[in-house]
Amino acid sequence: MEIILATETWQMAGAWYVRIQAMAKKHHITLDREFDALDGPDMRYILALDGDFPVGTARLYPLPDGESMMIGRVVVLPEYRHKGLGTAIMAACEAWIRDLGCRTAVLESRDNKTEFYAGMGYRITGDAFIDGDTFRCIRMEKRL
C-alpha cells in the first residue's frame, strides 16, 4: 500500500474514482453534488494505492484564516476499510498540512464517524448540520 500526494492527472482521476465508487454510487449522490467547485485543478489530493489501483483518498484546501486547512472527502473503498488505511490517509493529510505551514486541521465529519477522528486527536468544535441533504455532519479540529 502506498499513499501519495496526487499531482498528476491520472492520480487525481484515481481520487475521483474512489469517491464515485465509495460515495456517489453507495449513497446515490449525483456527481454534481459529490464534485463541487473546489474540485478543480488547484485542489490538493491524497491518494492511497494498492499497486496501481486507487483505494482511498482525501482532499485538502486552505481556509481563509491562513493557518488552517480543511480535510474533506476522506474515503476508503469498502473492501479496504478497517485495515488502518483511513488513519494512514489522515496522517498523510496532517503531514502535508504541516509542510504547507498551517497549524490546524479542520474537517466536517459524518456524525457516525466522529469517534474515528476523535481517536486521532480531533475535537468537536461545532454543532451538527446537514450536508447536501445527505449526511448529518459535525465540525472537528486538531492543532498540529
Label each PLM-derived region with a short phrase.
Residues 19, 117, 122:
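Conserved active-site tyrosine of GNAT-family acetyltransferases
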Residues 76, 82-95:
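Conserved acetyl-CoA-binding loop-helix of GNAT-fold acetyltransferases
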Residues 1-34, 39-40, 45-53:
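Short amphipathic alpha-helix that is part of the acyltransferase structural core
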Residues 108, 123-139:
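Conserved catalytic-core motifs of GNAT/GCN5-like acyltransferases
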Residues 47, 53-62, 68-75:
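Conserved beta-strand in the GNAT
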Residues 90, 97-110:
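Conserved GNAT acetyl-CoA-binding A-motif
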Residues 62-72, 81, 131-137:
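A conserved beta-turn-beta hairpin within the catalytic core of GNAT-like acetyltransferases
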